[in-house]
Regions:
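A short core secondary-structure module
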Residues: 200, 204-238
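Hydrophobic alpha-helical scaffolding
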Residues: 1, 45, 49-53, 82-86, ...
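Internal helix-loop-helix
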Residues: 60-61, 91-168, 211-213
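Internal maturation/activation junctions in enzymes
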Residues: 142-143, 154-190, 199
């Protein structure tokens, strides 16, 4: 039974010996403010580190015994088009199910939305193991961190609507690239027009080369201010 965490000492060594780790945890846990309201919230630094160690061991077990063994079959089958949607390879759904059953979604999101409230440092360690097992699957699973954008810049209504969905396992993408706008995102021309009659925005244009582009929730970059041609006329739409 392989384990990409316990079998490889590097990640554990780095977390346990980082001189900044205690401060990172204190900042993320806001002096352990959740300990009285959430049963699984850490009581102190030692408790937090023990929780991270246990969680990363679960990630290591899934990546070593599910994701990595499935990688060859995923490559052989590939994604395919079916009834207007893109379907992952069958083993990719098996990978997602294993991660979802273990509760490994919304990892950095606050507990009040159903997240695990992990520091990005710990989430990145988990991400490294997933990428080691199957870099293609890592592209799907790790795009849960698109929700950070909504958490930082969205309204509280948007947070309550979308963050719990990601924490429950729905997938995400960030739709940026267009036929004439790749690395130069200031050239994005997907047009966003406000529909006053229906109280919503209408998007008209093209996107392409979108990683995980048939996800459940999309953050779409579009030009919302008519007559602009740089980054100041762009907005992100859910």
């Amino acid at each position: 039974m392989a384990n990409y965490y316990s079998d490889i000492n590097e990640i554990k060594f780095e977390l346990e010996n980082s001189p900044l780790m205690q401060r990172i945890v204190e900042l993320k846990e806001l002096d352990y403010a959740d300990k009285d309201t959430h049963d699984y919230a850490p009581q102190d630094f030692a408790d937090a580190m023990d929780s991270y160690d246990r969680l990363l061991d679960i990630v290591g077990d899934i990546t070593g015994n599910v994701v990595a063994p499935n990688a060859e079959a995923v490559d052989a089958e590939g994604a395919h088009h079916e009834n207007g949607r893109v379907r992952y390879a069958s083993k990719t759904y098996e990978n997602l199910q294993a991660m979802n059953q273990a509760g490994l979604n919304g990892m950095t999101m606050p507990r009040r939305y159903g997240g695990l409230n992990l520091p990005v440092t710990v989430y990145t360690a988990a991400n490294e193991m997933v990428a080691t097992a199957d870099a293609g699957f890592q592209n799907i699973w790790s795009l849960q961190d698109c929700i950070e954008t909504l958490y930082c810049f969205g309204t509280e209504e948007q947070r309550q609507k979308y963050i719990p969905r990601v924490c429950a396992g729905e997938t995400m993408s960030m739709d940026l690239t267009e036929p004439d706008a790749g690395s130069d995102l200031q050239s994005v021309m997907l047009k966003a027009t406000y529909d006053e009659e229906n109280g919503c925005w209408r998007l008209n244009g093209s996107k392409r080369f979108i990683t995980n582009g048939d996800s459940d929730i999309h953050l779409v970059l579009a030009r919302s201010e008519a007559g602009t041609r740089d980054g100041r006329g762009l907005s992100m739409f859910i």
